[in-house]
Amino acid sequence: MDELPPELWIKILSRINDSESLARCRVASKTLNSLSREVRAVNLICTWSRYLKSRSIVVVTPFKTIFRSLIENSSKIRSISVGVDKALKGMSFDDFNEEDSKDLYLTDVEFVKEWLPRVREDLENLSISDFWIQSCWRKSDILALISSNCSKLVKLEVKNAWLSVVGLTEMPNLRYLTLEFIRLDDENLEKVNDCFPFLQELNLIGVGGLKEPRIHFLHLKSCHWTVSNAPLSLAIVAPNLLELKLKCNKPKSLLVETPKLVQCHLSVEDAEGVSFGEFQDLKTLELVSPDMYRLISNISFGNKIKKLAVDSVKSIEQSERLELGLATILKAFPGITSLSLSPRTWSDIETHFQSQGGLGDMKGTDSLKQITARVQMSDHTNVHQTVSFIRSIVNKYRGLTDMRLMIHQDKDPRVRSNLISTCMMSNPRVRWKWGMWAEGGEDMWV
């Protein structure tokens, strides 16, 4: 041990992700005990097994006590991650009597006051994942405490808590903010917009308490927003946003003004109130909606999209399923080179093909090079219909060079083999790639 220089030992100790393991290293030798104080990160998770022990007759050191000890035995901490294991997230109030407990209430201001002043000068990253059963009915003022103490904080992540914004002050150095499964007392996100003016990445996952939220950041580059059912009016105004992942249900109004957007994933149930500003550089687009026909027919996503993924999930009405054809998609996105289709979308456009007796009169595009699809076939007789559909696609779109098709893994192997051999023999100019898919499973290429 003495042969290694201290700097190397500090690097080794810094790679230990679990601070409990680091604590055991301290006990192992005086040298490690001394050097471990130079580690700049504290990472502590309350596991399921530790939780069960704390509820048994076995005497264990309280989780908060261990955490405070780790803070006290370290110097110049730059990163802190403390939380409960994901396995505890699914617990219900009936599982254990947690009504009066606070031992895992990690956004408790009084608890945070015990350790935050010690690390405030150097702290750059802070992640707190609370225990929902103890935190959901206790409003926390932790945001005000953090903003008044941590001037150098660059990255903040809070999960599973009820947060107040009273007393929250501006944090000009914060660049990354994640709020996940949070009840937030900021109905329109006004405080969030005002106090984090230089955010570059924003993740709002399952944030409740919102009414008419409006995201307005001049420097934002990436945004992931999963919206609950409650808000009826949503707005994103971010002139420098490059990546957007937005999932919402049925907003009466959705305004998106992000002219520099390059990559977008949009999931929406009802497209009636959706309004987008002009996209100058949008290259990659993924759409998930049962209202797909109206979404792609009524909204302009720009003419620079190269990669498109379409998932029409369950269509609202049978009549709308019949309207969604391949020509409809390619008319809306004439310049795409790559098209990915979900099982439902493949089924919809094949149904449209069969009902119309072909792909339609629209001129085939030469830009489309690759189609990736999860193929739906209900029975053996559908193989011939599917082959006819595929052959028509390949013949009409002459620029198409790659067909990547996955067949459901429960499909009869003979049916699968018949489809593969027929397609490859009748269309030799195309490069074929075959695979299998299953609901909830990973795609497997063969």
Curated annotation (Swiss-Prot):
Record carries keyword Disulfide bond: no
Gene3D superfamilies linked: Ribonuclease Inhibitor (3.80.10.10)
LRR repeat residue numbers: 59-84, 103-130, 135-160, 181-206, 223-248, 265-289, 318-343, 382-407
SUPFAM superfamilies assigned: F-box domain, RNI-like
One Pfam assignment: F-box
Keywords (A to Z) from UniProt: Leucine-rich repeat, Repeat
Domain F-box span(s) in chain numbering: 1-51
Repeat is among the record's keywords: yes
Domain of life: Eukaryota
PANTHER family: OS05G0510400 PROTEIN-RELATED (PTHR31215)
Protein name in the entry: F-box/LRR-repeat protein At4g29420
Organism annotation: Arabidopsis thaliana
